[in-house]
C-alpha cells in the first residue's frame, strides 16, 4: 500500500485542490453556495438554467449528513457510538455502504485508514477549533478503542464491540456524499457540473464545449488563494487531505488534525497535503488520507 501511495504522489500532486478556476464566468450556467458539512459547498451546473435542481442536491446533502455525522444527535453514527459494547444498531443502507467501504480501506491500508479513530479525534479536540495535547495516560486509555476489526457490519445493522468506541466517517463521508449528489444530478439530466464540497471536488463530464474543467491547486505553504498548479480533468474526482486545514499550537509547536491510529499523534511523514485524482470521490477521500498517513 505504501508503494502504491508513492506512485500516486508522483503521478499526481502533493498539493491541495481548492476549486475550479473560472467556473462561475461561463455563460449558460447556474450555481449556488451553502454552508454545509462544516465547509462552503458550491454546485455549478453548466448548460443548465433551472437552479432548483441544485436545491435538490442540497437536500440530499442534508439527508446524508443527518445519517453519517457522528455529532448529530439521532444519526446512525451517533446511535452506533451510544450503543457501543451494548447492542446492535439499525442503520440505513447508505450508512451500511459507507461502513463497508471503510472496512475495505482499513484492510487495504493495513490499518492506517481506520474510522474507529473517533475517540482519538475527540481526545485531541482539534476539530472544534480548540485542541488538547493528551497525556500518555490518556493515549494509553484511548488507543485500544481504535480497531475496525471490532466494527461489525451486517445487512441493515452495525455494532461496535467495546464500550467507548466511536466510528467517525470524517475521512470518507464527504467523498461518499459527493458521489451520491452526482448520481442525483445525472438522474435529473445534468451532463456538465462541478460539485465542490470544500477540498472534495467532483466533476460531471467536462465543459459543454468539450474542454476539461480546470481545478486550481492551492500551495499548502502559502496563504489561501495562492495556486501552485492546476489540474485539467473531466468526469473525475479531485480530493485533497492536508495537515494545514485544522491545527492548534501547544508549547510553541503546531499539531494538525490528521491523526495516526497507531501512535495516537498527528501524522509526521513530511507531506503537507495529498491530492488524489480518481473515478469516484469516496475512493479519493479514503486514499488521500491514507497516503498522507503513510507518506511517500
Task: Enumerate the language-model features and the residues they cover.
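Mature catalytic core of soluble alpha/beta enzymes
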Residues: 2-296
